[in-house]
């Protein structure tokens, strides 16, 4: 398979995770050029993990800053959920200067089915097997650990569902009090809560990749990168209102949205009654536009477990990283100890825009404003004309002109 054709499945799989992979730095992204994804991990481990294998003591390159290079023996002895890649050795520059490991697992860049695994020496820059040196381009095995991100600092700004001029109407209903001795009405008002969310994800998340959105440690819903999430939930709010006997109150449920689970917190607003003649409540405020801002912050793996690319069973990970070379008698020269998972200092900003629900009548707001301007303009002209006529009549009466003349 050509290198160019291998780039797309590599990218699609590398970024397959709860929210998607985001590059930690520009330096790491250059490693992925002309890389190949190891799709048959079980077969690979079966070939290199034998008891008599001469490859157990050599290293596997890590592409994640939180993970140090580890040996093939450590790779074979621990459950792995990372992505395994074959990367051209030239992408790493001079490995001898890094001083992490003297040898890495490699293979020739020729026919995938017949490529023989070899031991790449960082000093001599040659990859050898029991049968001699491997000619041509060399690929090194590397691990790419998932980077998990969590939505934090959710800030609610505004929300709108325009059925009247700026009034966020969620539902409306009628309360009737048929009891002559009872001045309170207890009634449930139901409404549909629509939610439309469009995620603007980092450019490194491939379009069409399945994503899962978590609220804390609970999966809220699933969507696909590049698509808009939509849901309609039937909700009920309990209304207890003071009402005079035999009266009727029209109520409107207006809403705001909570920070946690995007639930509407509705309140009742009295519109009018047939007895007391209430007008619009002064507490009904106009809510315009819609924008929810949040930050995408990298957090610990246990918040959202990585996707296991080659096993049907979900992975079980401890909160901390497995110690490299733990319990192994063979340790590479210059091997660095493992580091714990830490949150990235940089925050990736994501804007979650609540799409406009649309008005009950398209263009209602503009039409209403235009009609109001026209109405008051005509009213103003009419009032001015009435004043002018009144003044003219008084003047004619005082001067005995027109119909007020003696002749």
From Swiss-Prot:
Disruption phenotype: RNAi-mediated knockdown reduces oocyst formation by 50% following infection with P.berghei but not with P.falciparum.
Annotated transmembrane regions: 367-387
Tissues in which the protein is found: Expressed in the female midgut epithelium.
Segments on the Extracellular face: 25-366
Membrane topology according to the record: Single-pass type I membrane protein
Protein's cellular compartments: Cell membrane
Quaternary structure and interacting proteins, as annotated: (Microbial infection) Interacts with ENO/enolase from parasites P.berghei and P.falciparum.
Membrane-side (Cytoplasmic) residue stretches: 388-407
Name of the protein in question: Enolase-binding protein
Chief place of localization: membrane
Gene Ontology terms: cellular component: plasma membrane
Organism domain of life: Eukaryota
Keywords per UniProt: Cell membrane, Glycoprotein, Membrane, Receptor, Signal, Transmembrane, Transmembrane helix
First and last residue of the signal peptide: 1-24
Glycan-modified residues: 52, 78, 161, 250
Role: (Microbial infection) Acts as a receptor for ENO/enolase from parasites P.berghei and P.falciparum. The interaction is involved in the invasion of the mosquito midgut by P.berghei ookinete, but is dispensable for P.falciparum ookinete invasion.
